[in-house]
Amino acid sequence: MAYIMLTLLIGMVLGVISVASNPSPYFAALGLVLVAGVGCVVLMGHGGSFLSLVLFLIYLGGMLVVFAYCAALAAEPYPEAWGEWSVLGSVLGYLLLVVGAGSWFWGGWYEGMWVPVDELIEFSVVAADSGGVALMYSLGGGLLVVSAWVLLLTLLVVLELTRGLARGALRAV
């Protein structure tokens, strides 16, 4: 199980690197879908099956629609692929950054970090992942509303910046 989790975590880091190198909106959206899927599988591996399912459905329902809308508005006839030299340079830079940070912080910090969700399930009335979701929506409701407004504002700012002084990459709809 440890090797499967290590493989999933490496896949998640590589997916985040593919999103951060951001060659084109199309490839970035694909990378984000892969990172969300692998992250939800990591959550399921640690016992949070309900939370990972809810997060994945929210991601597919909300964020993928936003990415499809942005990709439809981005008029890019020749998108940059991952095989081009500029993108490969940024991918190698991010890989070196991850390896350097991992070697710098290597030590015993990870021993208490990977505790399964239902380790003390005998003493609990509610399952830990559904109780955590209820707590997130009850006490963190205001933060969720603020986060949604910030995401909407970010979308509008990005769409305005791509337009620029002239038409830019924004097509007339």
Curated annotation (Swiss-Prot):
Q: What does this protein do?
A: Core subunit of the mitochondrial membrane respiratory chain NADH dehydrogenase (Complex I) that is believed to belong to the minimal assembly required for catalysis. Complex I functions in the transfer of electrons from NADH to the respiratory chain. The immediate electron acceptor for the enzyme is believed to be ubiquinone.
UniProtKB keywords: Electron transport, Membrane, Mitochondrion, NAD, Respiratory chain, Translocase, Transmembrane, Transmembrane helix, Transport, Ubiquinone
EC annotation from Swiss-Prot or TrEMBL? 7.1.1.2
Gene designation per UniProt: MT-ND6
| Recorded topology in the membrane | Multi-pass membrane protein
Query: Which spans are transmembrane here?
Result: 1-21, 25-45, 53-73, 87-107, 139-159
Where's it found, cell-wise?
A: Mitochondrion membrane
GO MF terms listed in the record are: NADH dehydrogenase (ubiquinone) activity
The keyword Transmembrane appears for this protein:
yes
**What is the official name of this protein in its record?**
NADH-ubiquinone oxidoreductase chain 6
Any one GO CC term of this protein is:
mitochondrial membrane
InterPro entries with a match to the protein in the record? ComplexI_Subunit6, NADH_UbQ/plastoQ_OxRdtase_su6
Tell me what reaction this enzyme catalyses: a ubiquinone + NADH + 5 H(+)(in) = a ubiquinol + NAD(+) + 4 H(+)(out)
Q: Which family does it belong to?
A: Belongs to the complex I subunit 6 family.
Q: Pfam families per the record?
A: Oxidored_q3 (PF00499)
Leading EC class? translocase
